[in-house]
From Swiss-Prot:
Gene behind the chain: plsX
Catalyzed reactions: a fatty acyl-[ACP] + phosphate = an acyl phosphate + holo-[ACP]
Protein name: Phosphate acyltransferase
InterPro entries listed in its UniProt record: FA_synthesis, Phospholipid_synth_PlsX-like
The protein's assembly and partners: Homodimer. Probably interacts with PlsY.
Lineage of origin: Bacteria, Pseudomonadati, Pseudomonadota, Gammaproteobacteria, Legionellales
Enzyme Commission number: 2.3.1.274
Originating species: Coxiella burnetii (strain RSA 493 / Nine Mile phase I)
Amino acid sequence: MLKTIALDAMGGDNGPKVIVPAALSILKKHPKVKLILVGKEDQLALLIPEKNRKSFGQRLEIIHASEEVGMDEPPSQALRTKKNSSMRVAINLVKEGQAHACVSAGNTGALMATARYVLKTLPGIDRPAIIAAFPTKNEREVRVLDLGANVDSTPENLYQFAVMGSILSSAAHNIRNPRIGLLNVGEEEIKGNELVKKANELFETRKTINYIGYVEGNTIFNNIADVVVCDGFVGNAVLKASEGVAQLIKQHAKEAFSEAWWTKLALLPAIPILKRLIRRVDPERYNGATFLGLNGIVVKSHGSANIKAFVCAVEEAIFQVDKNIPQLIKEEVAHILKEFENK
């Protein structure tokens, strides 16, 4: 059976000129995947070579959508007035069962508002959260949530995020009890604001997750926890700061190799090491944040993603379709709720 992914082909800073080549790359790499490009049909068709149309056949489809959601468009306006946007139509395909997942590089707020309106949240989940993977000092990634879906959260919200993050991490790394940390300004019990302290009490009271306690910002990447939980305000700051540091490392490495020839000569033995370092921290490799907790799979690509980065976002969607993440969350939450009822 083919895994079908709907792509918002008009979304993001680069739109079809990145998304169409990325789609062709995915189809070459994943023979059991079908992609639906949603957008302005005439523009999309021009970017697909005839040889690709023939070779991919029914695995590549275009569905016309006459409207686009602007990157700066207010989410409420997009939800209310852009019912035939490429974003809305792609999400509708998931709702209708014509696609297993949707990937968009479009306006984050509009995507969240539309996805939540169309797909709804899973039973027992009050709010969806944005989750993404980050590199650590070894090969195992850490997943952090919420990265910006909810600026204001309750302790119960954070607990639900922890449960969902645990399920996704378990599926990604094939581990039974992922380590869950709560992001705080220190590891001591007395530190933190009221939200974090109450969430800590809740996490310790409920024995449904492998809670290891507080995690500080400087240890997120030390492989102390498999999942780090925080509210969306803090999480988005972590995301942007991490991306900035990664870009700084790449920039310094490039500058080092653009200096005088004798500097380049001295650096020659270090080239393989620097390449590995850059690859490990490259944000493109980790592109693809998931709107976790929805009754369907929606993956958000960075708006400025290039072809390589957008391919990574689509592959995150393929992985979640393979593992049927929404169903796993639904089953685990139902099990937890039943346990609470019996107490």
